[in-house]
């Protein structure tokens, strides 16, 4: 099967069922490297702690995860693009990005990139869809398309994502009793990709080991990203990104004109110390600000 036909099949599965699985996105050595490095980040950085209703409880200081399991079931490191070239490779991965683009279009954006570590004993998440914050009639065109790369084998016992196939086409949110989800059991290194309208949940982790993963979420180019990467990633670092990654975090244009600076993409100004348009009108702007 050619790459284009494989991508077409995967995009078709997302359209029909709301999700698909891409096998062997990471090999065993890469899984081990990401797992070791994300553990290092959890030791060295403040971590986001959240409970299974997806309520963020706050930040834990480096190397310390509170033991009060009533308060939290998840540990996350946000904005992974700040933490090394291995993470820069994830949003542009050749097995992932073509599928995302097939769902959202070439003008899509990276919404966020983070670790998602479900702790032992975590209870199941509530049934939810990732685009429920948008006040739009359902079903609607795909607004979000998300990828989760397993850093261990995902099983029904350790918190494998449970999906309700076809629910991305439902006209309204479900009411209790909620439908039972189908566990998507995948191997370490595989990726689950789903339409943001798909109703799903992370099952309870009934084991004594964490269930680590990498999450790479995308949105169409005309909605707001969850993480403001234009401000949170230093420009000096963005200059080192490959051009496609620069576009994905917001330095490109949507439909050839949205997000522009002087009718040019923001990436054109990454190497400029000052914006040429501002140079031309600096005195006038300063006067206007004083007024």
From Swiss-Prot:
It comes from the Bacteria. One of its GO terms (cellular component) is plasma membrane. One of its GO terms (molecular function) is 2-oxoglutarate-dependent dioxygenase activity. SUPFAM superfamilies: Clavaminate synthase-like. Belongs to the PhyH family. This is Uncharacterized protein Rv3633.
């Amino acid at each position: 099967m050619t790459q284009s036909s494989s991508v077409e099949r995967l995009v078709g599965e997302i359209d029909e069922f709301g999700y698909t699985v891409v096998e062997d996105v990471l090999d065993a050595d890469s899984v081990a490297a990401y797992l070791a490095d994300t553990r290092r980040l959890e030791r060295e950085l403040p971590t986001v702690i959240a409970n299974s209703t997806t309520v963020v409880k706050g930040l834990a200081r480096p190397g310390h995860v509170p033991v009060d399991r009533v308060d939290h079931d998840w540990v996350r490191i946000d904005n992974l693009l700040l933490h090394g070239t291995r993470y820069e490779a994830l949003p542009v991965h050749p097995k992932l990005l073509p599928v995302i683009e097939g769902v959202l279009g070439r003008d899509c954006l990276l919404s966020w990139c983070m670790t998602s570590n479900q702790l032992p004993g975590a209870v199941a998440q509530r049934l939810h869809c990732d685009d429920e914050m948008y006040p739009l009639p359902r079903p609607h065109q795909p607004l979000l398309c998300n990828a989760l790369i397993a850093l261990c084998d995902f099983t029904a016992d350790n918190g494998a994502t449970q999906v309700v196939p076809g629910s991305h086409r439902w006209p309204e949110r479900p009411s209790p009793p909620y439908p039972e989800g189908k566990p998507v059991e995948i191997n370490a290194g595989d990726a689950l990709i789903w339409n943001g309208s798909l109703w799903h949940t992370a099952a309870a982790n009934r084991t004594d080991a964490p269930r680590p993963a990498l999450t790479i979420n995308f949105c169409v180019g005309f909605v707001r990203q969850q993480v403001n990467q234009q401000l949170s990633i230093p420009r000096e670092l963005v200059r080192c990104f490959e051009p496609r990654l620069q576009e994905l975090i917001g330095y490109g244009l949507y439909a050839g004109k949205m997000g522009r600076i002087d009718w040019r993409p923001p990436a054109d100004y990454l190497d400029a110390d000052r914006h040429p348009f501002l140079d031309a009108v600096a005195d006038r702007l300063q006067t206007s600000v004083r007024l």
